[in-house]
Amino acid sequence: MKRIDTIKIQGFKSIASAELTLGDLNVIIGANGSGTSNLIGVFRLLERVLTHHLQLYVASEPDRLLHHGRKITPALTVDVTLGENAYGFKLKAVQDTLVFEYERNGADLIGVGHKESKLEDIAPLSPHPVLKPGLPEWGHLMVYHFHDTSDTSPAKQTVDVDDNR
């Protein structure tokens, strides 16, 4: 079974830039507010892109997905390698949505300016393996997300409302 080998993220929510090398099992631990939920959110974003639900995910609020909003970060990028496959995209804010500044399968450019992935459209034409939601490797991706919501959790403590960074 193939697995995601690496994922590179730029400009997604609290993640300015990150590159992760993944193994068969990955455990991510962090304090509340440290960005662990946003890291998991990248996999949700990827799933929404690959299943043609990006615009539902954006929900007319692209700034909530961009690192400190479009004034600071006008676009976000995600690059994934999975065995011999590679897939990546850059999404930029345009009015109340995100559109593909580019989308690529390996080194092959799929397109620009579209609102939903065109990956499945190129699958029959591509000489290279195509990363798409129907492939068995995506069926084995499982994400479990646990929260500390106990009474002593930092999320339930009094905080300075002006401390937003």
For each feature predicted by the language model, list its residue ranges.
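Phosphate-binding P-loop
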Residues: 17-23
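Conserved lysine of the Walker
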Residues: 35-36
